[in-house]
Amino acid sequence: GLPRVAVDLVAPPLVHPHSQVAAGAPKVVQFRMSIEEKKMVADDDGTTAQAMTFNGSVPGPTLVVHEGDYIELTLVNPATNSMPHNVDFHAATGALGGAGLTQVVPGQEAVLRFKADRSGTFVYHCAPAGMVPWHVVSGMNGALMVLPRDGLRDAAGAALAYDRVYTIGESDLYVPKAADGNYSDYPALASAYADTVAVMRTLTPSHAVFNGAVGALTGANALTAAVGESVLIIHSQANRDSRPHLIGGHGDWVWTTGKFANPPQLNMETWFIPGGSAAAALYTFKQPGTYAYLSHNLIEAMELGAAAQASVEGQWDDDLMTSVAAPGPA
């Protein structure tokens, strides 16, 4: 008897339109995700990886509901795919997060409904028996945000709001190399499996990236904002720990494990995301320019690719920073 609303998902880093404060009673929110197996380019050198994706993107799209709502997901595995797939929602209770009820072989679809009974940002990922790590690091992960019905709050209970929201999915890739030292290119998922798992077992990623590829969120693809705008960043890592840092900025309010029932930490320089979780960080930009948002494991950021940029427009505030003397002879 609850009202129903269908939501069209969008590809990261964007998030589908939503209200920050719930309007009315709980409802059933309907989503549809189609699984796509495809080859993706991992870096500027043209390195390829056989990927498995929700809706064709890495990470998959971010879903947003309010606490008390019901999520009704139709999961589609087209006949053009080769593998069985499912979905485990870390926000869900029972049946392996839904994985036990959503296993679909190519040509099948399943519908899962569960109650969003706690607020926060949560990871979801594919979890087929015997192949979980391979599917997860091959791209099948994303984030779900369950907002409190009255919106975000600080530790004192004052309302917090955001002007923009972006979602960043951090991935560790394990691309095998051929005997000549160059990265291998595989024609299909099955042909990549054994070599990829062998690299995975070294626990040494070939790439550590935001949103599927080196440079996916830099340059022309940078996040955008304006001075005075408050931006919420949802950052998920389905497999390994991460240490996000905004160079030239901060985390004004940070839910490091993403759970909005817990008070946010204030004025963070770097925050910690345990593998298998999603954090939420809110920052109001105070200066224009190009910011770097990266993992402060700097080797992963600068050598393996775990970095993004934010391009911020507006007027410079000399009170916050000024050049007293330009570089010159000593």
Swiss-Prot record:
Species annotation: Alcaligenes xylosoxydans xylosoxydans
Binding site for Cu cation 2: 90, 125, 296
Gene: nirK
GO terms (BP aspect): denitrification pathway; nitrate assimilation
PANTHER family reported for this sequence: FI03373P-RELATED, MULTI-COPPER OXIDASE
Protein name: Copper-containing nitrite reductase
Chain positions recorded as Cu cation 1 binding sites: 85, 126, 135, 140
Domain of life: Bacteria
Family classification: Belongs to the multicopper oxidase family.
E.C. number: 1.7.2.1
Bilayer-crossing regions: none
Free-text comment on this protein's domains from its UniProt entry: The type I copper site in NIR plays a crucial role for electron transfer from pseudoazurin to the type II copper site of NIR, which comprises the catalytic center of NIR for the reduction of nitrite.
Gene Ontology CC annotation, any one: periplasmic space
Keyword check for Flavoprotein: yes
Reaction(s) catalysed (UniProt annotation): nitric oxide + Fe(III)-[cytochrome c] + H2O = Fe(II)-[cytochrome c] + nitrite + 2 H(+)
Domain Plastocyanin-like: 1-165, 166-330
Subcellular compartments: Periplasm
Alphabetic keyword roster: Copper, FAD, Flavoprotein, Metal-binding, Nitrate assimilation, Oxidoreductase, Periplasm, Repeat
Keyword Metal-binding annotated: yes
Cofactor(s) in the UniProt record: Cu(2+); Cu(+); FAD
